[in-house]
């Protein structure tokens, strides 16, 4: 199996898809900007009265449960059902699933009632949703007991989706194919919003793609590669975050193809 990451980025930058976000208040601006940086267009509509109309214009729908409310959950379900009817891929970032009952039950409800194309979360979130011993502290992973690839496959089997587990090595699998991505830099974990931005990129790459393993691997490799490049010229968290967005904006298909560190199992 081979993955054509360069073509995935070229397709994105050619199509410039609209990516509809229903996301959290902490990182909404970061998500909008990183979507623009990669070459897509963001829209952050979450009023239940308009989300179905907005999804009809979009190439992908990103659902992020970082700052949940009853109204937002309702909007996610309405938008998700519309996306399923229109075959628009749905990306779920189950931020903090396992930390509180609301987050855990909401993530499971979205996975049960919607056909989610990609679930992207940290080890604790993915482990918890897969029924393994995933541990979450606030919205951050506090560890995972068990083999991470097996845990990801368990979640794939439960909900018929592609699963991406972020970490020092990112894992992407649809149950049959397993891709490991070794791009990234430790500084990505010490500024807020990078996990949410990765989910936004996953949505941007997913728009119009029929291969969610390839599109998700391309998104995470692109973001990790940008993080490596940003770390070389940043001297602190703030300059790193700015440099990270600049490096995402500077990515080209040849640069991604040359710099991606992927292993296929």
Swiss-Prot record:
Pathway annotation: Cofactor biosynthesis; thiamine diphosphate biosynthesis; 4-methyl-5-(2-phosphoethyl)-thiazole from 5-(2-hydroxyethyl)-4-methylthiazole: step 1/1
Keyword Nucleotide-binding tagged: yes
Residues that bind substrate: 44, 193
SUPFAM superfamilies: Ribokinase-like (SSF53613)
E.C. code: 2.7.1.50
Keywords: ATP-binding, Kinase, Magnesium, Metal-binding, Nucleotide-binding, Thiamine biosynthesis, Transferase
Catalytic reaction list: 5-(2-hydroxyethyl)-4-methylthiazole + ATP = 4-methyl-5-(2-phosphooxyethyl)-thiazole + ADP + H(+)
An MF annotation (GO) of this entry: ATP binding
One BP annotation, GO: thiamine diphosphate biosynthetic process
Pfam family membership, one: HK
Required cofactor names: Mg(2+)
Top enzyme class: transferase
Annotated binding of ATP, by residue: 120, 166
HAMAP family reported in the protein's UniProt record: Thz_kinase (MF_00228)
Family: Belongs to the Thz kinase family.
Function: Catalyzes the phosphorylation of the hydroxyl group of 4-methyl-5-beta-hydroxyethylthiazole (THZ).
Protein name according to UniProt: Hydroxyethylthiazole kinase
Name of the gene encoding the protein in the UniProt record: thiM
């Amino acid at each position: 199996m081979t993955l054509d990451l360069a073509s995935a980025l070229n397709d994105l930058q050619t199509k410039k898809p609209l990516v509809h976000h229903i996301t959290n208040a902490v990182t909404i601006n970061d998500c909008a900007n990183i979507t623009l940086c990669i070459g897509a267009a963001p829209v952050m509509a979450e009023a239940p009265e308009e989300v179905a109309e907005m999804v009809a214009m979009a190439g992908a729908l990103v659902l992020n449960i970082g700052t949940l409310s009853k109204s937002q959950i309702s909007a996610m379900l309405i938008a998700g059902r519309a996306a399923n009817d229109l075959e628009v891929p749905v990306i779920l970032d189950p931020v903090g699933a396992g930390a509180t009952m609301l987050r855990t039950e909401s993530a499971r409800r979205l996975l049960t009632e919607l056909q989610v194309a990609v679930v992207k979360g940290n080890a604790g979130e993915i482990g918890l949703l897969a029924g393994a011993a995933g541990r979450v502290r606030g919205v951050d992973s506090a560890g995972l007991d068990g083999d991470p690839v097996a845990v990801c496959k368990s979640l794939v089997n439960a909900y018929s989706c592609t699963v991406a587990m972020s970490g020092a090595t990112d894992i992407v699998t649809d149950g049959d194919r397993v891709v490991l991505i070794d791009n990234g830099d430790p500084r990505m974990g010490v500024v807020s919003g990078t996990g949410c931005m990765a989910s936004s990129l996953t949505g941007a790459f997913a728009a119009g793609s029929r291969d969610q393993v390839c599109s998700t691997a391309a998104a995470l490799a692109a973001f990790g590669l940008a993080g490596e490049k940003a770390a070389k010229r940043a001297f602190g968290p703030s300059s790193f975050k700015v440099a990270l967005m600049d490096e995402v904006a500077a990515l080209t298909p040849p640069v991604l193809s040359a710099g991606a560190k992927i292993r296929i199992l």
